[in-house]
From Swiss-Prot:
Official protein name in the record: 3-deoxy-D-manno-octulosonic acid kinase
Broad class of where this protein is predominantly found: membrane
Subcellular localization, as worded in the UniProt entry: Cell inner membrane
Family: Belongs to the protein kinase superfamily. KdkA/RfaP family.
Gene that produces this protein: kdkA
Active site residues of this protein: 167
Length: 240
C-alpha cells in the first residue's frame, strides 16, 4: 500500500492495481474523458463502473441515507484519517482477504477534509465480473444445496475473521458465473471479538430473505436457510 497525504487530503492505494494517477482516479469525469466508464448502478448515489489498466473497478462516493442524509448528504465528522469511512473500509477489506474471505479487492481510498471538522470520502474497489446478487438470481431460479452450503461457509469465514457485516442481506451476497460466493458493501462494518453478535447478524440476513420472498417472490424456503446454517452450526454457531 502507498499513501499520498496533504493537510486536506489522504489517499491510500494499491500500486499493483492502480496505475492511473491516484488523485485523478476518484473523478467520474476523468474516466469519462478516457472513455473508460463501462456502466453504473444507482443506490444512495451513482456507483460508476470503470475499466482501469489493471482491472475493472467500482467507484463509489460515500453518501448518507435516511432523513439525516437529506440534510447532510455526503459529509462526515472528522476524527482522524484512519477513521474515515473510506480508509476504514479499505483496511477492513484487506483484513478479510488475508483471512480468505471472498470480497472485492480494495484498490484505492480517499478522504478530503472540509474545514476542521468534516470530510468527504470515495473508494475504488474491484468489480466482480459477471456477478448477480442473490435476490436477482432467486427471482429466476433456485440454488443447489451445495451453493447454499458455500454461502454459509463464506459467512462463517467472515465471522471467524471477527468481522460484523452491519448490513448483511441477500443483496450484499453475490455469485459470479462460476457460482463462487462473494460478500460486498462493507461500509460501516467493523471487527468484533467473541461470537455473541454472530447470531444476530445471521438473523438480520434471514429477515432479508423473508422480506424479499414477500416483496419479490424469490425462490427461497426454510430448507435453503437450514442448508446455509448447517456449515455454521457444525463449526460452533447455532445460527437462526
Amino acid at each position: 500500500m502507498q499513501i499520498i497525504q496533504t493537510k486536506q487530503q489522504y489517499i491510500c492505494y494499491n500500486p499493483e492495481l492502480l496505475t492511473e494517477t491516484p488523485e485523478m482516479a476518484f473523478s467520474s469525469e476523468f474516466w469519462q474523458q478516457q472513455n473508460k466508464i463501462i456502466g453504473s448502478a444507482q443506490g444512495r448515489g451513482t456507483t460508476w463502473f470503470v475499466q482501469g489498466e489493471k482491472l475493472a473497478m467500482a467507484l463509489r462516493h460515500y453518501r448518507r441515507g435516511g432523513l439525516f442524509g437529506k440534510l447532510v448528504a455526503d459529509s462526515y465528522l472528522f476524527s482522524g484519517w484512519d477513521k474515515t469511512r473510506s480508509v476504514a473500509e479499505f483496511s477492513l477489506l484487506n483484513h478479510l482477504i488475508a483471512h480468505q474471505v471472498n470480497v472485492p479487492k480494495p484498490v484505492a481510498a480517499r478522504a478530503v477534509r472540509l474545514g476542521w471538522f468534516r470530510y468527504q470520502a470515495d473508494i475504488l474497489v474491484e468489480k466482480i465480473a459477471n456477478s448477480r446478487d442473490l435476490v436477482g438470481i432467486l427471482g429466476q431460479e433456485t440454488l443447489s444445496q451445495q451453493v447454499w452450503f458455500d454461502v454459509g461457509a463464506m459467512i462463517k469465514r467472515m465471522h471467524d475473521a471477527g468481522v460484523c457485516h452491519t448490513d448483511l442481506n441477500c443483496h450484499n451476497i453475490i455469485l459470479d458465473d462460476h457460482k463462487t460466493v462473494w460478500i460486498i458493501d462493507f461500509d460501516k462494518c467493523y471487527r468484533l471479538e467473541g461470537a455473541n453478535w454472530q447470531e444476530k447478524n445471521l438473523a438480520r440476513l434471514h429477515r432479508s430473505f423473508i422480506k424479499e420472498q414477500g416483496k419479490r417472490g424469490i425462490l427461497f424456503n426454510e430448507d435453503n436457510w437450514q442448508w446455509l446454517c448447517k456449515v455454521i452450526r457444525v463449526n460452533g454457531n447455532k445460527g437462526q
